[in-house]
Amino acid sequence: MNTEEKKQSRLTKKQKRNIIIVIIVLAVMVLADFVWSNTYIEVKKLSAHFDNLPEGFEGCKIVQISDFHNEWGKGYIDRLTEKVKDCEPDYIFVTGDSVDQIFPDVDRSLEFMKKLPDICPVYLVMGNHEYNLSQEEREQFVAGCESYGVNVLYNEHTTLTRNGDTISLLGFDNMENDSEAFSQVTEDFVILLNHYPEDCNYFSKTAVQYGTHIDLSLIHISEP
């Protein structure tokens, strides 16, 4: 191999090395962006005003958590818990898909659920991912939640009392067996928890049939 051929060979090797490094750097940059976007916790604060909200609930703070999907480790769970604490909520509402159906890790979800009742009362409805778990996994999740003090609502009605005033809370995981829950509503202000946005119209119409209405629907959101 003459001098020129050796020079071209060295150049080719150098070019290949540079290309590989660029690909690795780009891959790392893409991975870093993916990890950041999937572990960064953004708190979105909304204020809602209602003419019929009882005076005792004036200034009430609610934290809604949805689609946790047991995807994150202890560090993320700790940070998320601190974010929730910082909001100083009166109630925490968990609206489904706390466990992932494809890669289920019930213990990890329960690790998070265990921390929430230490902050304030917690109410939970299940989503499609919980219902697509095995029966054993689903029962493990529900039993764990209830043992930690999380109130799991199955198509049922309960009440929340604050400063002497009471409002209704409805929690649904499907559109079946809803008549008993709606028939129990006697309060003027009603909150609905449900995972499925497409069901909201149905529940609104059903509420009217039972002589009541829904003031606030909290449903599936795309990120916890």
Would you name each region that the model predicts?
Residues 1-52, 56:
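N-terminal membrane-anchoring alpha-helices
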Residues 4-8, 15-16, 75, 104-105, ...:
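Short, well-ordered secondary-structure micro-motifs
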Residues 41-74, 184-188:
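Mobile, glycine- and charge-enriched loop segments
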Residues 43-50, 79, 108-111, 152-156, ...:
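Alpha-helical scaffolding within the catalytic cores
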Residues 52-53, 70, 130-216:
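Conserved catalytic scaffold of divalent metal-dependent phosphoesterases
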Residues 60-143, 148-151:
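Membrane-embedded segments
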Residues 62-64, 93-95, 123, 169-171, ...:
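Structural motif
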Residues 217-224:
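Residue-level detector of conserved catalytic or cofactor/ligand-binding positions
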